[in-house]
Amino acid sequence: MQPNDITFFQRFQDDILAGRKTITIRDESESHFKTGDVLRVGRFEDDGYFCTIEVTATSTVTLDTLTEKHAEQENMTLTELKKVIADIYPDQTQFYVIEFKCL
């Protein structure tokens, strides 16, 4: 079995598969992904594969510069997005936006 290249919390799986979630915001440890990369995607909880994505763009962002567009691409409100990011990455301010599409 091939290893997964990136994982998402299971709660995001349906939104990814339906095309409602089209970005992910990560910390520096996952800043190496580049436009054009094709990635196997698994669930964080069990590493079970559930789709393949292609990276369509990358950029940097801070918690303070997150926008309504980022929130829309994450399929949540801006307030929810800021809370999720702060919960996952406490005490961090610099993040990496990975835009993607399911293949």
Swiss-Prot record:
This is N(4)-acetylcytidine amidohydrolase. GO terms for molecular function: hydrolase activity, acting on carbon-nitrogen (but not peptide) bonds, in linear amidines; N4-acetylcytidine amidohydrolase activity. It comes from Escherichia coli O1:K1 / APEC. It catalyses: N(4)-acetylcytidine + H2O = cytidine + acetate + H(+); N(4)-acetyl-2'-deoxycytidine + H2O = 2'-deoxycytidine + acetate + H(+); N(4)-acetylcytosine + H2O = cytosine + acetate + H(+). The keyword Hydrolase applies. Keywords: Hydrolase. SMART domains: ASCH. The keyword Manganese does not apply. Coiled coil: none annotated. The lineage of its organism: Bacteria, Pseudomonadati, Pseudomonadota, Gammaproteobacteria, Enterobacterales. Catalyzes the hydrolysis of N(4)-acetylcytidine (ac4C).
